[in-house]
A protein has these predicted regions:
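Single-stranded RNA-binding regions, centering on S1/OB-family and related RNA-binding modules
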Residues: 548-549, 553-725
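Short, ordered loop/turn segments at secondary-structure junctions
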Residues: 38-40, 129, 239, 322, ...
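Short flexible coil/turn linkers enriched for glycine and charged/polar residues
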Residues: 15-16, 28-29, 95, 121, ...
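Short beta-alpha junctions and helix-cap segments that line functional grooves
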Residues: 317-319, 329, 387-388, 521-524, ...
């Protein structure tokens, strides 16, 4: 049997030794971000995603092995183990295979077959199964089994048939074959429930059928939702008679048996009563699990790209949380995120109130030198955008606006964290502050919100919530550690996502900072309560200290590699102090790209990946990797439905990526749908081509005013470019 390491290595296309090293590091309590960044030599430079897959797969395979041993022990206790069964158990590579093999030996509730055995009908059942009787009358033979509990020959045959049905149902071979055939030949069929209040949402699925093997995840989740709401009836349809005949043929030893018809009926009963319901349930569950996995993956990719949006630093920002009845809440923050002013204004009511609001807000924009308006994308967003565009034009203001994803802002504004951060502000104003800060530093603000509330997925409320939470937490952890955080300004909300730091330790770090006037070196982390050497090893490299005594504290170089970093600097004719001298640092940065990494690593007896990473860190101390990405799209003018028509080319921001395409915000109230057929090749997923936050140009190919739908295409633009060329 292949080792677990070999199995995972084959799946990932890496070497078994890499997997073994990664598992050893994980078992020792190291975190994925730490291993990915600082143990590259040990793992052969395995990436974050690969390490997480290894973590999940080794857990599954260990559970599989534990279950295998449980089953072997249980069967041995029953003294029913055979060499053939043992071989099959040892070959099983899925939990489902093990459970199928264990089914005949699993303790059962009192079944019809059990009752029949208790009544002495097992010998009759064996005659039926083994086809040993080829002459005489079946009822005459059955008479021999009449008793007080079995009053008639027909009752005897029925009881024996129940035993036969259970034998057939318990066959791992039959179940495995039928399961494969159902996946290959089955259809999911949907039927609309006419008197259901939700039926209008699912009209497209009335009398709908699709092959099991071809159903995309978003369609599986859609029909599942319809079933859950009682609007759809779902069923798995397969060639039942073909399957029954296959099993009858498989269990027949002699076609001349007088019990042939009895056996055929027992097989049909086994299929309809026991096998099909179980396999239908298995297949539906597998479909749902697969769809959940895909939806969660898409959500994770979208969340990652959203969190990696570059910060719009240096702006004084006015956050606008739109609303109708209670008005639009406004908050102005400075370049450090501190609240300068706030209030509520009516931007969507009477013309008089709108004019008053315009004058007052324009006055504040000039007073505080606001350069950017951040408008939440919820209720009344489009009307607020129209107001902002008109105000900027009429008041001749030197600022732009941006539409910001406000999902989760209301949840955050009422949270304990928001109360602690903004104790003097009303709950409604806190939402406006959050909308402003999300533009200033999307990562720092978004980590304060439950990732599930951010709203960049598909069917996120329908999928396995435990798995969704687990995956999204991993995404947040990966992004936060990839970017790194400033130790002296980071909130507990973001610190708790750093490798090795818990929520309690994050609060202790902030408390230490407040009591001691801030950190001056990474080493001081060891003085923080409950942050010991092991946690320090995990977290230190991801925490930056601008202005620290040791300039390496403001880089991604891990303290364990400081000595190596100094030697590299020395080899180039510089000292550590030169990193704090602008002209010397610039001179060093000219030399760094010219270094032969392999030679340097060999000379210093160090790992090539570590030397490469140290050189990259020295080249850009304190670098924020988000700065390399294109800045978000800001606007001065609103787009109206009258401005667009088929053939218009628009520029917009990718708001969400799903299995069937992407939704693009190009300044209209409704996001345009860029269907995958108008975006990418057949086998590509939209997320292979686009990411949340990307700025793209697309052509409008359809406008449905009645249904409020706009269709977009990038393929048409490519085709036009080809013709021009």
């Amino acid at each position: 049997m292949e080792s677990m390491f070999a199995i995972i290595a084959k799946e990932l296309g890496v070497k078994p030794g890499q997997v073994e090293s990664a598992v050893t590091l994980l078992d020792e309590g190291n975190t994925v971000p730490f291993i990915a960044r600082y143990r590259k030599e040990v793992t052969g430079e395995l990436q974050d995603e690969q390490l997480r897959t290894i973590e999940e797969r080794i857990k599954y395979l260990r559970n599989l092995e534990a279950r295998r041993q449980e089953i072997i022990n249980a069967i041995m206790e029953q003294e029913k183990m055979t060499d053939e069964l043992m071989a099959s158990l040892m070959k099983a590579v899925k939990l489902q295979e093990l459970e199928d093999l264990y089914l005949p030996y699993r303790p059962k509730k009192r079944t019809r077959a059990m009752i029949a055995r208790e009544r002495g009908l097992e010998p009759l059942a064996e005659m039926i199964v083994n086809d040993t009787v080829t002459s005489g009358n079946s009822l005459d033979i059955a008479k021999e089994y009449i008793s007080e509990e079995v009053p008639t020959p027909e009752d005897a045959i029925q009881g024996a048939s129940d035993i036969v049905a259970e034998i057939v149902s318990d066959s791992a071979d039959f179940r495995a074959t039928l399961r494969k055939r159902m996946w290959k030949e089955g259809f999911i069929q949907a039927e609309l429930v006419e008197d259901n209040e939700h039926k209008d949402q699912f009209l497209q699925y009335n009398e709908y059928a699709e092959p099991v093997r071809q159903m995309p995840s978003h369609r599986i989740l859609a029909v599942n939702r319809g079933e859950k709401l009682g609007a759809l009836k779902l069923a798995l349809t397969v060639p039942d008679e073909s399957y029954i005949q296959y099993m009858v043929h498989g269990i027949t030893k002699n076609e001349q048996s007088i019990f042939s018809d009895v056996k055929a009926s027992a097989v049909a009963d086994a299929y309809k009563r026991l096998i099909f319901p179980a396999l239908e349930r298995d297949i539906r569950n597998e479909l749902t699990e697969s769809a959940d996995e895909q939806a969660i993956k898409v959500f994770g990719v979208n969340l990652k790209n959203l969190l990696l949006q570059p910060p719009l630093a240096g702006h004084v920002i006015m956050g606008l949380d739109p609303g109708y009845r209670t008005g639009c809440k406004m908050a102005i923050i400075d370049a450090q995120g501190n609240v300068l002013d706030y209030g509520a204004y009516y931007l969507t009511n009477s013309e008089k109130l709108k004019q008053e609001a315009q004058k007052k807000l324009a006055e504040k924009i000039r007073k505080f030198n606001v350069t950017l308006l951040s408008i939440g994308n919820g209720t009344a967003s489009y009307e607020t955008e129209q107001f902002a565009s008109k105000m900027i034009e009429e008041e001749k203001l030197d600022c732009h606006y941006i539409i910001t994803n406000e999902a989760g802002a209301s949840v955050y504004s009422a949270s304990k964290l928001a109360i602690d951060e903004l104790p003097d502000l009303d709950v409604t104003i806190r939402g406006a502050v959050s909308i402003a800060r999300r533009v200033q530093d999307p990562l720092a603000e978004s980590v304060k919100i439950d990732p599930k509330s951010i709203g960049v997925g598909q069917y996120q409320h329908d999928v396995n919530q435990k798995q969704l939470t687990h995956t999204l937490d991993q995404v947040v952890e990966s992004v936060v550690n990839h970017v790194g955080v400033e130790l002296n300004t980071a909130s507990p909300a973001i610190l708790q996502h750093i490798a090795g730091i818990s929520g309690t330790v994050a609060k202790n770090i902030v408390a230490f900072r407040q009591e001691n006037g801030g950190f001056t070196s990474r080493k001081q982390l060891l003085k923080v309560p409950r942050l010991g050497p092991a946690a320090f090893t995990q977290c230190a490299g991801f925490l930056r200290l601008n202005g620290a005594k040791n300039p390496l504290d403001n880089t991604s170089v891990h303290p364990e590699s400081y000595e190596l970093a100094e030697r590299i600097i020395g080899e180039l004719g510089f000292t550590l102090k030169d990193l704090q001298d602008k002209s010397q640092l610039e001179a060093l940065q000219v030399k760094l790209p010219l270094v032969d990494v392999d030679k340097m690593a060999h000379k210093l007896d160090a790992g090539v990946p570590t030397v490469r990473d140290i050189i990259a860190a020295l080249a850009k101390p304190g670098r924020d990797p988000r700065e390399d990405l294109p800045a978000p799209l800001t606007r001065k003018h609103v787009v109206s439905l009258e401005d667009i028509k088929v053939g218009t080319v628009v520029k917009g921001t990718v708001h969400n990526v799903v299995d069937f395409g992407a939704f693009i915000d190009f300044g209209l109230k409704t996001n345009g749908l860029l269907h995958r057929s108008e975006l990418c090749k057949a086998k590509q997923h939209p997320s292979d081509v686009l990411a949340v936050g990307d700025i793209i140009e697309a052509e409008i190919i359809s406008v449905d005013v009645k249904r409020n739908r706009i269709g977009l295409s990038v393929k048409s633009l490519r085709n036009k470019d080809k013709k021009k060329a």
